[in-house]
Design a protein with these regions (language model features):
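Conserved short "hinge" loops at termini or chain/domain junctions
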Residues: 1-8, 16, 20, 78-82, ...
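Beta-sandwich interaction modules
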Residues: 45-49, 97-145
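Short beta-strands within extracellular/lumenal beta-sheet-rich domains
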Residues: 32-51
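Non-cytosolic beta-sandwich-type ligand-binding/adhesion modules
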Residues: 66-116
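Intrinsically disordered, low-complexity acidic/polar tracts
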Residues: 24-27
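A short beta-strand element within beta-rich, extracytoplasmic domains
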Residues: 51-73
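Edge beta-strands of jelly-roll/beta-sandwich modules across compartments, strongly enriched
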Residues: 144-157
Length: 176
């Protein structure tokens, strides 16, 4: 069981098409916020990578973005990047209880979070996308259109190691 949880991503990359990556590690870690652009074109990707699994990204926005929903989220499943629906994009039953669904996905329009449900991406595997870093990667894009690309001051994560499963507590207490 890991003993240290860090809230900074190990790797943050921007791919502006064709596999040309820009390293944004330092900017994403900056506490005071050194703004950088993310997803300015429909063929751009924001890559969030870490040596350990994570289940949430926290975005501190400088300039709000305007994207045609929904954004596309992908993870590497051992052979390819596979699309998944983050928790904030899951729809909830309306209050009027008529069986219809509503919901609003996070879209870089302001500070916010996106949750990557480990239950959905259970086959998440490490891969290398740039400069030889093998990591767990989440890839975000806006293939449906962009009016204004967002600029971000920093991006933080919630590592899966930030909490224990009941099995890990059981093992820690040596009840097995």
């Amino acid at each position: 069981m890991p003993t240290v949880a860090n809230e900074q991503f190990d790797y943050v990359r921007i791919d502006t098409g064709g596999g040309v990556f820009t390293n944004r590690d330092l900017e994403a870690r900056s506490i005071t916020g050194t703004s950088f652009s993310v997803i300015e074109g429909t063929d751009d990707f924001l890559y969030l990578g870490d040596d350990a699994k994570f289940d949430m990204a926290v975005f501190d926005i400088d300039t709000p973005g305007s994207y045609t929903a929904p954004l596309k989220y992908e993870y590497f499943n051992g052979s390819t990047f596979k699309e998944f629906i983050p928790d904030t994009q899951e729809f909830n039953l309306d209050d009027n209880d008529d069986g219809t669904y509503s919901g609003e996905a996070y879209g870089f329009a302001g500070d916010g979070v996106e949750i990557f449900p480990v239950r959905v991406i259970s086959d998440w595997a490490k891969t290398t996308v740039d400069e030889g870093q093998s990591a767990y990667w989440i890839r975000i894009s806006a293939p449906n259109g962009i009016t204004t690309g967002a600029t971000v001051k920093n991006i933080r994560k919630r590592p899966v190691e930030a909490y224990c499963t009941t099995q890990e507590v059981f093992e820690l207490l040596q009840l097995a």
